[in-house]
From Swiss-Prot:
Subcellular location: Cell membrane
Native source organism of the sequence: Methanocaldococcus jannaschii (strain ATCC 43067 / DSM 2661 / JAL-1 / JCM 10045 / NBRC 100440)
Stated name of the protein: Uncharacterized MFS-type transporter MJ1317
Record field: transmembrane: 43-65, 89-108, 156-173, 180-198, 224-246, 259-281, 291-311, 316-338, 351-373, 380-397
SUPFAM superfamilies named in the record: MFS general substrate transporter
Entry keyword annotation includes Transport: yes
């Protein structure tokens, strides 16, 4: 009798584990749709801004504000999610908010409107990210690197399709930037379908956790890692500067190609990002997050140095490919490392704090990059290279 009950409990636990692991794929497909939508917009956003009168500082402002707004919300939403032990409602609200502001961005006709609505669109990311990542970490606790790698691979596969669609719409249908953004907004609303099937891990609300206690209870190693991540973020300014660098170089060669080729290079970046996200996540499960992150930060520094001094038509292909590899090394593994270093009851708070600190530094990062660009583009990328390599070396001391 006891054995039979034990077997039934084991079977029930296995079924629950399978249900939870499905969450990773459902959230991955949600990310696929969202990034298809977002990445139809992202490669053309810097061109949209410059076409309506914005300059490098405008690009720096929108690049910084987008990350600042999204990340500043994450610690508060993460804390609220831990407090009430609810994840899914915040995830749904986040994706819905993003889609609504994409729609308004598509109706915008000025650089100021592009800055405002593009920045507010990232509120959605700030609302959904920490609770979503907490669901992933609770669904695959023994293989976090693989879990976040799967989510990141879906995310980036959607990005490849989205930026490819953007390129095809321009090449063959001659759609305007605004038309492409409106189509992207419609796709964004489709993210709500797979979210319906996500199941939360049941757990009681934790009224004992206050915001201050949640932050105070974070381990010293985690706080140190978040500090180093902030230093790295100062080097990791907006992707738009990489597209702008390629566009300005190609303008000398062919004005028409200066629009098409940067989008194609951005697709190449996403292909390498998607291809290596899961392998590098699995690698971090085996050899440790810190080792993989150190390599990622240093590779990013080398890429930034390449954009400063080794620009040619052929080198742009190599540099955008390495840019994708660098992101595959550090993007998902940063979140996995934060999850490793935090307990389950404060995990969303820890992830939220990580994103918020990163967000606070992303605004000055892109503004500094925009200011340095006015001196020379080389200065922007040299600054990024030095800080990234320093960050990689600092990880060795955790």
């Amino acid at each position: 009798m006891v054995r039979k009950v034990a077997e039934q409990n084991l079977q029930k636990n296995n079924e629950n584990d399978r249900e939870l692991s499905k969450n990773v794929y459902l959230l991955g497909f949600t990310s696929f749709l969202n990034d298809m939508s977002s990445e139809m917009i992202m490669p053309i956003l810097p061109m949209l801004i410059t076409s309506v009168g914005g300059g490098s500082l405008s690009i720096g402002l929108v690049g910084g504000l987008r990350e600042f707004i999204s990340n500043i919300l994450m610690v508060l939403i993460g804390y609220c999610s831990d407090k009430v032990r609810k994840r899914k409602i915040f995830v749904v609200l986040g994706y819905l908010t993003s889609s609504m502001f994409k729609l308004l961005l598509g109706l915008s006709k000025s650089w100021l409107g592009a800055v405002i609505f593009s920045s507010l669109e990232r509120m959605g990311k700030g609302i959904r990210t920490a609770p979503r990542d907490a669901i992933i970490s609770e669904s695959m606790p023994k293989t976090l690197g693989k879990g976040f790698g799967i989510q990141r691979a879906f995310d980036t596969a959607g990005a490849i399709l989205g930026s490819t669609l953007s390129l095809l719409f321009i090449l063959y249908l001659q759609y305007s930037f605004n038309q492409i953004i409106l189509i992207a907004a419609v796709i964004g609303f489709l993210t709500l379908i797979p979210l319906y099937f996500v199941k939360e891990k049941p757990s009681p609300s934790n009224n004992k956790i206050t915001f201050r206690v949640g932050i105070k209870n974070l381990p010293k190693e985690l706080k140190l890692f978040i500090l180093i991540s902030a230093i790295f973020t100062l080097s990791n300014f907006s992707y738009m500067f990489y597209i702008l660098r390629a566009q300005e170089f190609l303008m000398i060669v062919d004005e028409k190609m200066a629009i098409i080729i940067p989008i194609a290079l951005y697709i190449l970046y996403n292909i390498f990002y998607a291809t290596f996200s899961i392998p590098f996540g699995i690698l971090s499960d085996k050899i440790g997050r810190k080792s993989v992150l150190t390599i990622g930060y240093i590779v990013y520094g080398i890429v930034s140095l390449g954009f400063a001094y080794f620009i040619s038509q052929k080198s742009l292909i190599l540099l955008f490919a390495l840019y994708g590899i660098a992101y595959a090394l550090f993007a998902g593994n940063q979140k996995a490392y934060v999850s490793d270093l935090s307990s389950e009851d404060i995990r969303a708070t820890a992830l939220g704090l990580f994103y918020t600190v990163v967000g606070l530094t992303s605004l000055p990062a892109s503004l500094i990059a925009g200011y340095l660009w006015k001196i020379s583009p080389e200065m922007t990328f040299l600054y990024g290279s030095v800080l990234a390599i320093i960050s990689g070396l600092l990880l060795l001391f955790i």
